[in-house]
Design a protein with these regions (language model features):
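Alpha-helix-loop-beta-strand connector modules within alpha/beta enzyme cores
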Residues: 187-202, 221-229
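Short, contiguous, pocket-lining structural segments
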Residues: 186-193, 209-214, 246
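Distinct, well-ordered alpha-helical segments
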Residues: 152-156, 217-227
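His/Asp/Glu-rich metal/cofactor-coordinating catalytic motifs and the adjacent surface-exposed loops
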Residues: 223-233, 237-238, 244
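Positively charged n-region of N-terminal signal peptides that target proteins for export
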Residues: 1-4
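Bacterial N-terminal signal peptides
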Residues: 7-18
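N-terminal hydrophobic targeting/anchoring segments and the immediately downstream early-domain regions
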Residues: 17-188, 237, 241-408
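Substrate-binding cleft of carbohydrate-active enzyme catalytic domains
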Residues: 197-210, 214-217, 250-256
Length: 408
């Protein structure tokens, strides 16, 4: 009997020890992930936060009950470099689009100045690193839609001088010189003028963003650009077969020329199940969206809130499936398996998309680092994905821009 008691005690002790080792190991990974995340430059290439600034009631410096981005949540999530999107609807063209874009740029710059204790305007990789060393959040700007140059190539120089560092060639609609992925083809990709736009962007140190564009526009831009392309907020078509996403061939040729695709967190682009279900209710959604536009007018934040409420109602009613934040990891992993860890990063579409369950805002970003670490990614590769890859492309762009300007 005594032997049995001793034996049971030994087993209990061994199991307790084993359990302790496992817990310690799990805690060690969590601790390593947190240390890695908060010591890295975490650079997201697309947030529509300026639309919230336009309301005049949103204070970037205070934690907000709505939306995805504000300074307190950026601090909590270790998000220390963010591209703010300058967005005007593609139905506004010419001088009005230019003026509205300039107003948004000015608004972003004002907010950075207003919150100078926490924020710093950045236009290149060196300035991002400097802000990080100072404990500040680097704010950058990208223009979402080539219609905002108003068919005037000189506006690229103006926007670049004001600190804009990328431009998406088209948005949901075709513009005057580039086809969109979600509109009927009008130009067979890029027009001659569109190709000149890409060359001028190279010259002015403005990254060429191929999110939203048609496949033909993408291949045209790839052929013309001397600087690696970026997809500021796109996901993998092999996982969710949406035209906004990139095919495996597109990812391969993008990577072959040094480019980077930044994964979008929008449910429609993350999950094929969700995309298919959404397509089945698209007619109802379109009718409701028209209703929202009538009620909200030009207030994109109002429209966005109404759309998110509608999607939550449809999910609650079982018409749309839930989408886990872990789909983001699936998309990242697909790109890494396809072309390696040097060509993928984070392009959330915060404040402009419906986030997946478990990653409701930017405060949840450390989950991504921990998940990648648990999958066996090296710390070096995780740092690349968090921001290092896009910093590399920015440095290449700056170098090529100087060479092109010197050759003029």
């Amino acid at each position: 009997m005594r032997r049995m008691v001793v034996f049971l005690c030994l087993i209990s002790c061994s199991c307790a020890g084993l359990f302790f080792v496992r817990c310690t190991s799990a805690d060690d990974i969590a601790d390593r992930a947190r240390q890695l995340h908060f010591s890295s430059i975490v650079l997201d290439t697309h947030a529509d936060t300026p639309q919230r600034l336009l309301t005049g009631t949103f204070d970037l410096g205070k934690r907000d009950a709505e939306g995805h981005v504000d300074i307190p949540r950026m601090r909590e999530g270790g998000l220390n470099a963010q591209f703010f999107s300058i967005f005007i609807t593609g139905k506004t063209l010419g001088p009005p689009a230019i003026q509205l874009a300039l107003d948004q740029i000015d608004l972003v710059r004002q907010n950075v100045q207003q919150h100078g204790k926490d924020l710093a305007l950045a236009t290149n990789a060196e300035e991002i690193r400097r802000a990080h060393a100072q404990g500040k959040i680097a704010i950058l700007m990208g223009i979402e839609g080539g219609h905002m140059i108003g068919n005037d190539i000189r506006m690229i120089r103006v926007y670049s001088a004001l600190g804009v560092r990328y431009m998406t060639l088209a948005h949901f609609y075709n513009d005057e010189w580039a086809d969109s992925s979600t509109d009927k083809p009008a130009h067979n990709g890029l027009t001659h003028f569109g190709k000149e736009v890409v060359r001028e962007m190279n010259r002015q140190d403005m990254l060429v963003d191929i999110s939203h564009v048609s496949d033909k526009t993408f291949y045209d831009a790839l052929e013309v650009s001397r600087v690696p392309l970026i997809a500021s907020h796109s996901s993998v078509r092999a996982i969710s077969n949406h035209p906004r996403n990139m095919s495996d061939d597109m990812i391969k040729v993008l990577a072959a020329k040094g480019g980077v695709m930044q994964i979008n967190y929008e449910r429609n682009y993350l999950s094929e199940e969700y995309r298919t279900a959404f397509a089945a209710v698209a007619g109802d959604v379109s009718r409701m969206e028209e209703k929202f536009k009538k009620e909200c007018g030009d207030d994109n934040v109002c429209i966005g809130k109404a759309e998110i409420r509608l999607e939550k109602e449809l999910t609650g009613a079982g018409k749309l499936p839930h989408v886990s934040w872990e789909k983001i990891i699936e998309h990242i992993d697909h790109v890494v398996r396809l072309v390696g860890p040097d060509h993928v990063g984070l392009g959330s579409d915060f404040d402009g998309a419906d986030m997946p369950d478990g990653l409701e805002d930017c405060s949840k970003l450390p989950k991504i680092t921990e998940a990648l670490l648990r999958k066996g990614y090296s710390e070096e590769d995780i740092r690349k994905i968090l921001g290092g890859n896009i910093l590399r492309v920015m440095e290449q762009s700056e170098k090529i821009s100087k060479e092109m300007q010197a050759a003029q």
